[in-house]
Amino acid sequence: MESRDLNLRERQVLGIIIQAYVVSAAPVGSRYIARNCNLGLSDATIRNVMADLEDEGYISQPHTSAGRTPTDKGYRYYVDLIMKVRRVNDEEKKRIDADFGQLTTERRGSSSEVLLSAAKVLGSISRQLSVVLSPALSNAVFEKLDMVLLSSTRMMVILSIQSLIVKTIVMELDLAVSRQEVSGVVDLLNQRLSGLTLSEIRKTISMRLSDCLADASLINFVVRSAGQLFDETPIIERLYISGAGYIVDQPEFKQPEKVRDFITMIEDKFSVAKLVERNRIYSETVHPSRMEVSISIGKENRERKAEDLTIVSTPYYVGGMMGKLGILGPTRMDYGHAVSVLNYMADCLSATLSEVN
C-alpha cells in the first residue's frame, strides 16, 4: 500500500525535524519546534503531527529520547518534495574557481591532476567522502597513436583519446623491430582506426587490417594485443577519493566498529567506484533543481556496508564522454548543499578538463 501524500503541516514539521537533526545530530522534540520555528502551533498539536509521521514511518523515536529522528523514508520524502537547493555561496565558489583556475591558467594540470584536485576540493567543501570517476572509455573515440621504441624488443605505446585522455602502455615485443617499421605501422594504424570508438576497434581490428597481416610482423603483434591496447581502463584506475577524515569525525562514527566498517568499505575501491557508477534516481518524483543528480539513501544502496550512508552523485561531460562526481556520507546530510555543490563542481570540472586538454 502506497503512503498518502503529506499535508502542509506534516511537511513543515518533517522538514524542520530533518533540518534541525542535520545540524545538531540530536533527536528533535515538539517543544523545540513550538518554541523556535514560528509555525503558530501548540506543543500538543505538534506532538500529534509527529505521532502521525512516526506511525507512517517518516520519523522514529530512538531509545527513550523524547525527540524524533528522520528515517530513510523521511529523508526520501524530504529530498523529493520538500528540499530547497540553494546556490553555492561566494566563499565556496572562490575556492572552487581558484583551484581549477590555477590548473587551467598555468596549463600544468594533466587530466589526472584535475580529477584529483576535484576530489580534494569536493571533500573539503562537502565535509564528506568525495569520489570522482574519470569517463569510461568504451565509447570514447580514438584519435591517434604513437609508438616509441625503447629497445629492439620493448616499446611504449601512447594513445590519444578524444583529446581528453592519454593512455600510455609499455609493451614487451615477441620480435625485434626497427624504427622505420614502427613509423610505418603508426601511420597505418592512425589512418585505419582514427575516428572509431575503442569498442569498435577491439571488435573489428582484424578485419580492418586483414590485408596487412600476411607479412607485417608488428601489425600482427598489434592485432593480437588489441585487447590490452584498446581496452577499457579498469574502474579502480578511474577512481579518485578524498575526505575520509571528515566522515570519521562525525557523530555517527563514534563507535569503533562503525569506523572499522567504513574504512573496510572504502579500502575496497572497486565497490566504492561501483556504488557511485551505478547510483541512480530511486524515485519517480524528480526535484526540478536536482538536474541530473542521483541520490540513494540508506538501505536503497546495494552494498550492505553502505546501508547507513547516502550517496549523492551527478555526471560531468567532456568530449562527448561522461564521468561522475559523488559524495558519500551519513544519511544525516545537508542534501540541498550537497546537490548545489555537485552541480557547480560538475560544470567547473567539465570546463576545466576541456581547457586543460
UniProtKB/Swiss-Prot annotation:
Q: Which Gene3D superfamilies does this chain map to? A: 3.30.450.40, Heat-inducible transcription repressor hrca homolog, domain 3, Winged helix-like DNA-binding domain superfamily/Winged helix DNA-binding domain
Which key words tag this protein in UniProt? Repressor, Stress response, Transcription, Transcription regulation
Which biological processes are named by the entry's GO terms?
negative regulation of DNA-templated transcription
Q: What domain of life does the UniProt record list for this protein's source?
A: Bacteria
* InterPro entries hit by this protein: GAF-like_dom_sf, HrcA, HrcA_C, WH-like_DNA-bd_sf, WH_DNA-bd_sf, WHTH_transcript_rep_HrcA_IDD
Q: Name one GO molecular function term.
A: DNA binding
| Protein family (similarity comment) | Belongs to the HrcA family.
Its biological purpose: Negative regulator of class I heat shock genes (grpE-dnaK-dnaJ and groELS operons). Prevents heat-shock induction of these operons.
| PANTHER family given in the database record | HEAT-INDUCIBLE TRANSCRIPTION REPRESSOR HRCA (PTHR34824:SF1)
This chain belongs to which protein, by name?
A: Heat-inducible transcription repressor HrcA
* Organism per entry: Chlorobium phaeobacteroides (strain DSM 266 / SMG 266 / 2430)
Q: What is the lineage of its organism?
A: Bacteria, Pseudomonadati, Chlorobiota, Chlorobiia, Chlorobiales
